[in-house]
Amino acid sequence: MWGTVLKRDLLGETREEDRFHTREEIREYLESEIYKQGENVVIRNLDVSLVEDLSELFRGIGWDIKTLDLSGWKTSNVKNMTDMFYQCESLKSLDVTGWDTSNVENMGGMFWGCHNLESLDISNWNTSNVKSMCMMLWGCKKLEALDLSGWDTSNVQSMSGMFYDCRRLKALDLSGWDTSNIKDMSWTFYECSAPYEVVDNKIVKII
């Protein structure tokens, strides 16, 4: 099925019966591709539009990947991205451009433990339905810059530990964030170099 999926994607003729139907099918395909491609993995334009749950997708199979290009994935129906790249410890560069995240509700722990991640552009993500960003970037020790100023955080309820141990993240733009519905902001900037702190459940920039 996998070869059919990719060929039909490239031709723009993907039929419903040829797409991935479950998270398990996607993981099996990814594991096969990672085995073939090694440390530098390119899997573009994958149609996962029939799947709502991508949680822990690379957990246990992405440890040795250094560069990962997942641009153009069709993610319009995905609701759960919890721990998606959990402990991809060798990962330095990740390309997720073109993702439709408008229906995602949970991004908790999404990049948890990506200790060597240096390059990540998620500035254009639609986060209007996200409720949890808890520990989303926990332990991303080598990230130096992130522009998240365009994010809609009006429905987020938890940012606990979101930037925990992002010790090099000095260039972080959170301007315009709405934290009015957040219930838990504990440890949001713990051991983080970004010029922000939490005061009365609000994110305040340190001058």
Predicted ranges, named:
Residues 1-207:
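Negatively charged
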